[in-house]
Amino acid sequence: MTPRFVPLSDVAEMLSISASQAYALVRSGELRAIKIGGRGQWRVEVTELESYIQRSYEATAHILEEEREQERQKASRDR
């Protein structure tokens, strides 16, 4: 059975980022998470992580499209 929630440390490992970077994503609101238990362990719902990854793909595609457009404009000016 696939878990519904994963610890923030697992999120960091899955995204190949540090634990502090994963926590920064939560603090900024980019990645939704909840605190569970007496020690306040952060957990991220797997569907939230998947949504974050999808949004990151879309943002990257937008950045790349802007870069391509800038290159086309530069090439037009250089002619």
Where on the chain are the PLM-derived regions?
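Basic Lys/Arg-rich amphipathic helical interaction modules
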Residues: 1-24, 46-79
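Major-groove DNA-recognition helix of helix-turn-helix-type DNA-binding domains
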Residues: 15-42
